[in-house]
């Protein structure tokens, strides 16, 4: 440092001596004052250079220490198991930390997509609740918010749906029996959920090959849909906020004899199953009023049980009938009334298991068992006419 300073001073003196020649006696007095200014400037530069060099040495020491610490950390991580390394990497990445699910809000709010149509693209991986069964208690008190109940809820007032329900921080005007859905939207949403349940039931039925995997089951397709005339307050609420259903009807349970017969034929194709058509008396439909067409058939058939003409509840609203393949050729003197009378007489004998099995055999296998009984002529056309008339009635 001293040698550098001496060299700089000598160079400056040589420059000043060569450039300044004393031509006047007064100039000799001003030269020493002008030479003092570059010398002081050089001193400042030298001090700054010394400071920078000291800072550089300090930084080099810190870098060496950091490298040593980093090497020690890497050695320690190599000795840790893989299960302990993954959480550390997850928290070290700020992008992953931003995408972390907040545990305090998991499953504390109803899923908006599920609330609208009971369908969600995330399915079981959704972080929101699909129904009140999955809803968890919130760890945050709503009243701690300064905006609690100070303005109207935008979702509830505009769309009619709010996934927060009673936990919403805002006001739900005209709150009906359901805190999640506005009263005028309740029927529309219930129909969407009913269609979703029906789709799930049909998919389950198709996956099982048309066979029931358990005992008697209740199907949503028999559920009575709520009508707009019913007040929203009287609609029954299920376990989920929009599970609105009416009374359900069950299929008649098969008797042991019918179970044996089912093994000798293809799987049931409900509602075209003959057993469901001729076992309508088990649905207890005797309280329904008689249509004019049915009264005409009753008068022509004589002592015919009314349960034979009971209307079966089907998803389409059309009475079920049996389609047993091609109908045998009718006699020249046979008529629809004669066929109805024969069908009624056969149905009256269904109280005994033996008579009912004979009737089912004659319908399912019209070409077999001619010694026992003959197939009823015109049964398909008669059943179709009855179904159309009952649907119009």
Swiss-Prot record:
List compositional bias (Low complexity) regions by residue number: 313-340
For bias kind Basic and acidic residues, which ranges apply?
14-26
Q: Which Gene3D superfamilies match?
A: Zinc finger, CCCH-type
Q: Where is this region: Disordered?
A: 1-26, 227-251, 311-340
- Show the SMART domains listed in the entry: ZnF_C3H1
Which Pfam family, any one of them, does this sequence belong to? Answer: zf-CCCH
Question: One Gene Ontology cellular component annotation?
Answer: P granule
Judging by the UniProt lineage, the source's domain of life is Eukaryota
Q: What is this protein called?
A: CCCH-type zinc finger protein oma-2
Q: What is the lineage of its organism?
A: Eukaryota, Metazoa, Ecdysozoa, Nematoda, Chromadorea
């Amino acid at each position: 440092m001293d040698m550098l300073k001496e060299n700089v001073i000598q160079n400056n003196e040589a420059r000043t001596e060569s450039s300044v020649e004393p031509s006047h006696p007064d100039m000799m007095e001003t030269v020493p004052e002008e030479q003092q200014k570059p010398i002081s400037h050089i001193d400042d530069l030298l001090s700054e250079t010394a400071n920078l060099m000291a800072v550089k040495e300090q930084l080099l020491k810190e870098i060496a220490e950091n490298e040593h610490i980093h090497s020690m950390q890497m050695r320690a991580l190599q000795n840790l198991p893989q299960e302990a390394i993954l959480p550390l990497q997850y928290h070290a990445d700020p992008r992953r930390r931003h995408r972390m699910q907040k545990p305090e809000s998991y499953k504390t709010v109803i899923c908006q997509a599920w609330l609208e149509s009971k369908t969600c693209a995330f399915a079981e991986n959704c972080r929101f609740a699909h129904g009140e069964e999955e809803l968890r208690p919130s760890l945050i008190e709503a009243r701690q918010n300064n905006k609690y109940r100070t303005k109207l809820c935008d979702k509830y007032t505009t769309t009619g749906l709010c996934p927060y329900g009673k936990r919403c921080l805002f006001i739900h005007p005209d709150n009906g029996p359901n805190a999640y859905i506005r009263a005028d939207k309740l029927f529309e949403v219930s129909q969407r959920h009913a269609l979703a349940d029906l789709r799930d039931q049909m998919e389950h039925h198709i996956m099982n090959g048309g066979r029931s995997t358990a005992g008697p089951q209740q199907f949503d397709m028999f559920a009575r849909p709520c009508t707009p005339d019913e007040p929203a307050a009287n609609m029954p609420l299920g376990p989920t906020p929009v599970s609105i259903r009416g009374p359900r009807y069950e299929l008649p349970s098969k008797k042991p004899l019918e179970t044996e017969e089912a093994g000798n034929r293809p799987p049931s194709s409900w509602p075209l199953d003959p057993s469901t058509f001729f076992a309508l008396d088990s649905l207890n439909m005797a309280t329904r009023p008689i249509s004019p067409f049915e009264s005409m058939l009753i008068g022509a058939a004589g002592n015919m049980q009314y349960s034979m003409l009971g209307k079966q509840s089907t998803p389409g609203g059309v009475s079920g009938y049996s389609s047993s393949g091609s109908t045998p050729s009718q006699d020249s003197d046979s008529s629809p009334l004669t066929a109805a009378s024969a069908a009624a007489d056969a149905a009256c004998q269904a109280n005994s298991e033996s008579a009912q099995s004979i009737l089912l055999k004659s319908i399912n296998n019209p070409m077999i068992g001619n010694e026992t009984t003959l197939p009823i002529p015109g049964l398909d056309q008669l059943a179709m006419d009855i179904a159309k008339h009952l649907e119009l009635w």
